[in-house]
């Protein structure tokens, strides 16, 4: 039996009435973490009050240093370990105090650590029956025997396409199903082979009805085969099975009875004013690296941990835009580790001890799960926009520029409109999010909205650095950066976001972004073209000169020649945002040259297995138009 290194350690802790929490076993070796700290994390406050509690915490966390030269591969070489911990309390009349409390943990590099819950439950039950090290040894062998050799390795762009698609067969050609799935002797001879006409070889057919967003495998433990579904669309900053929707619902106030925030004003957090939505305040705090505590007094530690993990996803744009949040996350921690916590800049931590609420110097933002309120610490430095500062200057310049507009009667009117715009942009975004949740949109759709929001923010920050800080503009065919209806809209956006952009530019995630962006641009298959910008033009601008539209389609054609280019191109057209529909408008353009180029682009995309699925998902109106025009040229 081949052992992989899916799991690094198995831990076992117990609560002793005389000694307190103690670490009893570490297998196969010691973790290197202080045993007292480990046992305290494995047996969280109040766990004995519940029959079962799941906890998540991290090991090997280092104070982040984005300036270090070593490049770390997050999936394979990262020292960060995620710990899935199960605490069980069993009432026993023969035990002192009438109960036995034990905790068993799996330490893994896998972000999808929740897949180990079923086997951990079985192992814990076995350990209560037979409390020996052999139980941990057999568990270690079972989880590391899980076969992932057939699991497809998606590129970043492929993963984003799969993530944004509801098509269960997307990338099906990359899967090799296990021969074990064809072991039915009754009809094996009938269906085990077919002739592939393209190659002339016999092949096994793929199993039908599988959701290719997951890889199916199994863990065999003590003779029991446990089916496992590994999510294939997980991004680097997404850990566990948290819910962003639950985070939003918990901290969204009743609008009809919301008097506005009573928190002290801070320009990084609530630029629009006291009616900033609490979730937007939290997002701004994440972007500007504030110290954040989630307090869940009386709540299971696992529930608190999931709020922390959801916040990490929120701030990172669900792992597609920024990174550096999970390395500063403490999904569950306690007073034993407070010194280590306070050494970490911009930590995001989950606690159940109400003592944290009293120590306002320990945190900048406190999110109380029980009350649904977000509090800004009175000790958070109150930063005023200084005269002549970058953030102040861009705001003043925008106001002065706008005040010269003939449509504005006075500076006062301009200022009022600008402030209203700053409120409206975020308020409209949150209204869209809440409406989607109310309409029962899924978790993936809600995460996608924050992914797009954070992406727009960092692209605006790039423009800010060029316009205000004097950094050189990025060279790109047909321009680079966000799209605005007019110059006034651009200045309003820069003014509204100046303070939090300045805050973000001082953070660890900003430094990582600079490195990652340089690497992405260097390794991109599509060079010298900002695809996102061109698609935004087709979506947002009402009137584009024919010459420019033609140039856009020609640029797309020139950059969708290889398979890798097609995949990268399609990743900019997520299907939950309409897929190819912005490009489909070209099929109806009054200019025959543009219709011709749009048709040529669609025909090229259709030759790709992935692109053909995008074509199938076109609206009926656009699909009929495409098929009719394609039939004429064949």
Regions found by a protein language model. Name each.
Residues 15, 20, 26, 129, ...:
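Short amphipathic alpha-helices and their capping/turn residues within compact interaction modules
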Residues 2-302, 309:
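N-terminal uDENN/longin-like adaptor modules and analogous extended polar/low-complexity scaffolding regions
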Residues 28-32, 119-129, 140-144, 305-318, ...:
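Amphipathic alpha-helical scaffolding segments
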Residues 280, 309, 321, 328-634:
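A eukaryote-biased sequence property
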